């Protein structure tokens, strides 16, 4: 599998070629500041030509390196989309301005505050003895193995989301729900919370074919070893395969 090496144009590269470019601070990573830059398509292509770079599809980030630049790229993508979609106040239609203290856009007229959109979602590893419930999405670009997943609803705890999503996608009931870890997922503006749980009662699967193309129990020995390291989903699958958790 090809590993895509990520690099970013530096300030001096852009300044030399596009002296009138406008910069917007995003974040700092290991003492390196990252900025959002407004450039025309022609200027972007020129900068890439000068620096020897090229654009890659965001989905290649799943297997890219170095990992700290993957984090920077995904987070930058998340913030770029938020800024791009929030120029005007949704309450009074006046132009929003950046707050001086926190990551927030504020309306100077009515006081409306707009924060970055972060969607809470769960990733669920359902176990059945030495087997793990693996799924594949229906109608999505990502075609590899996944776990049951879904968005948290208003008024719902994350544990309730786990039970509901497993039931909706596979018809299974679960018990002994345990939190594993979380991961920001800027591809889709999400914060992911990973959980492991056990099947409760029958292990007969009823697949929701609108959401999934398949769902099946897979033993540790049958789980593929060539999983991408980036995603929480694949980390959880690997943790189960290697029997490193409390299952």
Predicted features along the sequence, with ranges:
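Nudix hydrolase/Nudix homology domain
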Residues: 1-86, 141-145, 187, 208-247
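N-terminal strand-loop-strand
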Residues: 87, 104-147, 151, 173-174, ...
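Short functional micro-motifs and their immediate structural scaffolds
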Residues: 94-97, 115
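Short linker/helix segments within small regulatory modules
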Residues: 98-103
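Hydrophobic alpha-helical positions that pack around
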Residues: 148, 162, 166
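Surface-exposed, charge/polar-rich loops and edge strands
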Residues: 156
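Active-site-adjacent beta-strand/loop module that shapes the phosphate/pyrophosphate-binding cleft
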Residues: 183-206
């Amino acid at each position: 599998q090809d590993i895509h090496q990520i690099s970013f144009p530096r300030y001096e590269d852009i300044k030399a070629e596009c002296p009138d470019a406008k910069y917007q601070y995003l974040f700092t990573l290991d003492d390196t500041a990252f900025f959002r830059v407004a450039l025309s398509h022609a200027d972007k292509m020129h900068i890439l030509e000068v620096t020897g770079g090229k654009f890659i599809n965001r989905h290649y980030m799943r297997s890219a390196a170095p990992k700290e630049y993957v984090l920077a790229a995904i987070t930058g993508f998340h913030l770029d989309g938020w800024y791009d979609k929030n120029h005007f106040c949704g309450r009074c239609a006046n132009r929003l301005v950046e707050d001086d203290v926190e990551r927030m856009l504020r309306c100077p007229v009515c006081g409306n505050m707009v924060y970055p959109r972060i969607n809470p979602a769960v990733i669920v590893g359902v176990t059945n003895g030495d087997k793990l419930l693996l799924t594949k999405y229906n109608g999505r670009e990502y075609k590899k193995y996944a776990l049951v997943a879904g968005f948290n609803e208003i008024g719902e705890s994350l544990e309730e989301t786990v039970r509901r999503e497993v039931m909706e996608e596979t018809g299974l009931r679960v018990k002994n729900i345990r939190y594993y870890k979380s991961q920001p997922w800027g591809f889709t503006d999400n914060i992911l919370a990973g959980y492991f749980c056990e099947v409760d009662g029958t292990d007969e699967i009823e697949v929701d074919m609108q959401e999934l193309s398949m769902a099946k129990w897979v033993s540790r020995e049958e789980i593929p070893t060539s999983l991408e390291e980036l995603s929480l989903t694949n980390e959880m699958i690997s943790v189960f395969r290697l029997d490193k958790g409390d299952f």
